[in-house]
Amino acid sequence: MTESYVNKEEIISLAKNAALELEDAHVEEFVTSMNDVIALMQEVIAIDISDIILEATVHHFVGPEDLREDMVTSDFTQEEFLSNVPVSLGGLVKVPTVIK
């Protein structure tokens, strides 16, 4: 049996915080799956990487000096752009409400 890292109450709380509807019948499945994933992550964490040069595997910070200079271009007009959107209003793209 896999070690228990999370329990039923934590899965229910996590689903509630993520605004997910989780049926009671599936809670135990998620508990088992989550514990399996965490156990696998624990195995990966336990791997000895002391002989690996980490500097070679980490990307350096991308700063302004690494970015190209902005160039203002006009590839198409506002009307051409708006001709490809389903709904526009006052020269703007109208999108569905995503936050209640």
Swiss-Prot record:
Record field: transmembrane: none
HAMAP family, sorted: GatC
Keywords carried by this UniProt record: ATP-binding, Ligase, Nucleotide-binding, Protein biosynthesis
Residue ranges the record marks as coiled coil: none
Name under which the protein is recorded: Glutamyl-tRNA(Gln) amidotransferase subunit C
Name of the gene: gatC
Superkingdom classification of source: Bacteria
EC number: 6.3.5.-
Stated role: Allows the formation of correctly charged Asn-tRNA(Asn) or Gln-tRNA(Gln) through the transamidation of misacylated Asp-tRNA(Asn) or Glu-tRNA(Gln) in organisms which lack either or both of asparaginyl-tRNA or glutaminyl-tRNA synthetases. The reaction takes place in the presence of glutamine and ATP through an activated phospho-Asp-tRNA(Asn) or phospho-Glu-tRNA(Gln).
Organism: Chlamydia trachomatis serovar D (strain ATCC VR-885 / DSM 19411 / UW-3/Cx)
Molecular function GO labels: asparaginyl-tRNA synthase (glutamine-hydrolyzing) activity; ATP binding; glutaminyl-tRNA synthase (glutamine-hydrolyzing) activity
